[in-house]
């Protein structure tokens, strides 16, 4: 989580107020929940390489996760449970490595690293019961608390503190990006560490939360997902009287995240530009798109993606996986396609496009029984998975 904070705050002018010595030290321990998915068969040995983990890398990892819908559902379910009892540090999944940071790869398909206090031992049994619903138990599950490695986090009192000039960074929340928004309020620093308080809120309440934080900060920094990049927009508070934060304490900024406290923050009013902290995405092959339906796509920086199908805006944009047939085509505009069996292969052809692209002259489809199959079992029943004809 430390790396994610650095990434979203890289273009931010942080407050320089030096805080008083901490009045308390909160102590936690790291806890690792590692497990295998019993029915997942996947290997990326000698291929996987992620030398860094910037915002585009994290976005790509979240895109990859959507290709593993069952495993992603289980991870999201466990993360929702964990947030009631601890603070998530990072998430590992074999196809993407660590989601927001770096570290040694565990010998399991997935791992969740969190911090918890010594009074939260109940989480062990809760996680075991939750994962057992998905058949994850026994040798497929390991829960380890590193009692030898204590995490000490400073707590600073800001009651009556003067000359504070807090700012707030708003971005997607990496452990639930489609439903949660992340708010990091920077208050000041203590020695070489920045201090503040971090909140999450439902995405649908994002503008309500911004309006409530506005009277207490000098500037918002809105981190927006531009699909091919991320950019940060500063929105200054031009009022002269910034209210003191309605909290008594802040802490060293880290993975400690709280649900937003609506009752503490008074309602404010500000003009907020429309922005998207995160744009949900998933991969798609042309062959899996509906036939004879108008499809709208756009292109930017060698990435082509679909925004509308049948003139209806999609909740997720679809990143097109192009094959050799469309290798030299820039897909920007509208098109229609139809799937056919040609030369014993299940393929597709473009029947209409507003942009230049190759089209097959003969669009007549052969009988399904003539199609080459990945599995030849002698049966007449023919269909396809996402990738193979069977």
UniProtKB/Swiss-Prot annotation:
Database matches in InterPro entries: Poxvirus_F5/I6_dom, Poxvirus_I6_C
Identify one Gene Ontology CC term for this UniProt entry.
virion component
Record keyword DNA-binding present: yes
Q: Which Pfam families match?
A: Pox_I6 (PF04595), Pox_I6_C (PF12562)
**Member of which family?**
Belongs to the chordopoxvirinae I6 family.
Q: Tell me which species this is from.
A: Fowlpox virus (strain NVSL)
What keywords would UniProt list here? DNA-binding, Virion
| GO MF term list | DNA binding
Query: Single Gene Ontology BP term?
Result: viral process
Subcellular location per the Swiss-Prot or TrEMBL entry: Virion
What superkingdom does the record give?
Viruses
Described by its record, this protein's role is as follows: Binds to the hairpin form of the viral telomeric sequence. Might direct genome encapsidation into the virus particle.
Q: In its UniProt entry, what is this protein called? A: Telomere-binding protein I6 homolog
């Amino acid at each position: 989580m430390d790396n994610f904070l650095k990434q979203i705050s890289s273009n931010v002018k942080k407050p320089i107020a030096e805080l008083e010595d901490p009045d308390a030290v909160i102590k936690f321990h790291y806890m690792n929940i590692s497990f295998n998915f019993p029915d997942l068969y996947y290997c990326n040995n000698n291929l996987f390489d992620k030398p860094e983990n910037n915002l585009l890398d994290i976005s790509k990892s979240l895109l990859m996760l959507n290709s593993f819908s069952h495993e992603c559902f289980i991870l999201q379910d466990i993360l929702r449970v964990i947030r009631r009892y601890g603070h998530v540090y990072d998430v590992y999944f074999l196809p993407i490595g660590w989601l927001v940071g770096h570290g040694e790869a565990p010998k399991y398909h997935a791992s969740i690293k969190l911090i918890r206090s010594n009074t939260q031992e109940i989480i062990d049994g809760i996680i075991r019961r939750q994962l057992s619903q998905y058949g994850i138990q026994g040798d497929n599950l390991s829960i380890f608390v590193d009692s030898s490695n204590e995490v000490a986090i400073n707590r600073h009192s800001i009651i009556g503190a003067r000359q504070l000039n807090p700012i707030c960074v708003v971005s997607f929340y990496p452990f639930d990006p489609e439903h949660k928004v992340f708010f990091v309020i920077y208050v000041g620093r203590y020695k070489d560490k920045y201090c503040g308080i971090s909140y999450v809120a439902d995405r649908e309440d994002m503008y309500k939360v911004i309006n409530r934080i506005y009277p207490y900060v000098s500037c918002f920094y809105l981190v927006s997902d531009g699909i091919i990049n991320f950019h940060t927009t500063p929105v200054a508070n031009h009022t002269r009287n910034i209210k003191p934060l309605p909290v008594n304490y802040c802490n060293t900024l880290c993975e400690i995240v709280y649900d937003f406290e609506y009752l503490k923050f008074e309602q404010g009013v500000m003009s907020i530009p429309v922005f998207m902290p995160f744009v949900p995405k998933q991969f798609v092959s042309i062959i899996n798109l509906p036939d004879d339906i108008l499809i709208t796509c756009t292109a930017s920086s060698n990435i082509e993606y679909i925004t509308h199908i049948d003139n209806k805006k999609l909740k997720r944009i679809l990143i097109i996986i192009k094959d050799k047939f469309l290798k030299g085509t820039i897909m920007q505009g509208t098109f229609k396609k139809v799937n056919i069996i040609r030369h014993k292969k299940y393929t597709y052809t473009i029947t209409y496009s507003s942009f230049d692209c190759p089209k097959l002259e003969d669009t007549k489809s052969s009988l399904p029984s003539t199609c080459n199959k990945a599995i030849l079992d002698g049966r007449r029943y023919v269909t396809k998975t996402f990738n193979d004809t069977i």
